[in-house]
Amino acid sequence: MFLQLFNIVLIYGVRTSQSTWINYPENCTSISLQDGLRELCGGDQLMNIRNQLLDDTYKEIGEICTPNYSMEKKSEGYRCASIKKKVICKMLENFDHEVTYISESHPIDKAKCHELIINKDLLNNIEEPYYPPPKCDSSKSSVSELEFIKLINYDVILDPVGFQNEDNYLFQFDKTNPIPIDYIYQSEFCQSKNWICHGDKSYIPLEIFKGDNQASIRLELIKLSIIYDSNFGELPIRDACRLHYCGKPAIKLFNGAIIKIKESPIVLGLPSCNRSRIEMPETNLAKKRYSNVGPVLLTTLNKRFELCKKIKKNLELKQPIPINNLHYLAPFEPGKHPALVYRLVSTTINQSLRNKVVPVSMLSMSMCEYITGQIIEDGIKRNLTDEDTVIILANNKEIKWKDLKGRENWYQEQANPNIIDKNPDHLSYYWYNGVMRREDKFTYPSRYILQTLKKIYTDTERESRISFFKFRLERNITKTEVIKFRDIEESSDQDHSQSVNKTLEGDDYWNWVEETTSDKNKTDGSRGDEKQTIQNKEYWNEESSIWGISTIITVLGIYYIYRKNRREKIFLNMKHRVQRFFKLDY
């Protein structure tokens, strides 16, 4: 949940999900550009989470485990039974004898069985039950009866939650020790060694992405959720309860998932599960619901890191940087990291921000404490009001529209009078890491990794309609508009602003920014290896490529001229011109 990489807004976001995970900067203080550059890209490591809260709480939680539902639930062992053999002899009217044989078996409770095994050595003193000889009397029916205590081998599948009942037990025996061993919890499913566990390594280790280990990804996100719940929530783990599972203490989460963590005050503060929670269907965290998503995430991490280092190198060399590529420098981990803001952005007639280049002298750096949160997307509204809640952080802090607008370091773009001369209200304001607002709406760049992790975590959460952070806000939230662009092409020119507004007026807004869920097993692939010629011509574009209408028209025009001139026998001259055109840099 805390890996924030890409500047793309996923147009395949879940239709039922009403929020976008973000990494929000707070408590920012200005630092020099030189100091900020040293901290960019996480220093010299792929992941760099510096957060005292996480440092302290991770050790308290320790290892987190969940059942492996592919394991066999069958248990095999011994139980005691009282077996009665009866023989009834009755004389008939013709003076014949009718003999009836009856066998009865009655279970013996666990404590009594344990005592009998030790006192009577049932394991070695094996006696097969047999019927006594009939005793027939001429005057009345007679009954002969024998009772035997026997160990019976059982092969059963028992409910992992129902083991508290004394009638449910199985014993096994060590060859060197006649004392019975409680074995009901020893099915493959219940054995702790077969559970899927995520170690107490600090933070999200890169190993969880190898081999497409979606269970470890979910466990890590649950672990991070527990950290925030235990520090900021009303309960140590929100909407969770304690129960005995496979005979050991466990926790049932709000979505039915079963987990085990180290005994600590976090666990002891939970209530016991009532019957309805016990009977609630379980969620299999180990189920692989997406194909090959782990390696894609790992590849994305590495490519993002390499791209970030290239941009950082250009900044250190005082070279100007295309404005949209600066978003790649935004930190993707919580904790203390730099934030970048551009103090001056000029309005251009170009439709895409890709053509805007920001000089290094126009960049400012701040050191901020990042905390994970989510943007509230509860519908569409033309204008945000000051009291509208637009962001809720993991510590339950609300960020209202007036709070966001009142933050430091908002810079208004510089108007070009040849483009915008009558309505300066349509100018954009730029903030940290590419956050932008125009009039009473704002854009917050989303990240591919964050939203992919959200999908993995919330794929079972949707059914319960409970948000990941489980906020304690029981009230209706005023519907607000949060505009998200596919390729962060939030151009500040007037024409593009009008086209965006027209788009939002239609009924296809949700189809634009969200996905359909018709195929839950659809592969979440990478964004491809598209090349983008910028500065050193080695930048890898992590975003979705979107061609504007003007670009398409330009290409078609070039193609038309190319065909026309080829017919006119001046092909080589035209080929040279086309090559020169495409070699132009930004």
Swiss-Prot record:
Membrane topology category: Single-pass type I membrane protein
Coiled coil: none
Cytoplasmic side: 563-586
The keyword Glycoprotein belongs to this UniProt entry's keyword annotation: yes
Record topological domains on the Extracellular side: 15-544
Glycan-modified residues: 27, 68, 274, 350, 383, 476, 501, 521
One of the record's GO cellular component terms: membrane
Protein origin, superkingdom: Viruses
Keyword Kinase in annotation: no
Xref: InterPro entries: Rhabdo_glycop_FD
Signal peptide: 1-14
Places the protein is found: Host membrane
Regions crossing the membrane: 545-562
Keyword terms of this UniProt record: Glycoprotein, Host membrane, Membrane, Signal, Transmembrane, Transmembrane helix
Similarity comment text for this entry: Belongs to the ephemerovirus glycoprotein family.
Name listed for the protein in its UniProt record: Non-structural glycoprotein GNS
Protein source organism: Bovine ephemeral fever virus (strain BB7721)
